Swiss-Prot record:
Coiled coil: none annotated. It is found in: Secreted. Belongs to the cationic peptide 04 (cupiennin) family. 09 subfamily. GO terms for cellular component: extracellular region. The keyword Kinase does not apply. The keyword Secreted applies. Keywords: Amidation, Secreted, Toxin. GO terms for molecular function: toxin activity. This is Cupiennin-6d. Its main location: secreted. The modification Serine amide is found at S21. Expressed by the venom gland.
Length: 21
């Protein structure tokens, strides 16, 4: 469960970064 959350956060951060561009 924790692992999944970490993965989601990573993906979210990556997506956020792309949106910022």
């Amino acid at each position: 469960f924790i692992n999944t959350i970490k993965l989601l956060i990573e993906k979210y951060r990556e997506w956020k970064n792309k949106q910022s561009s």
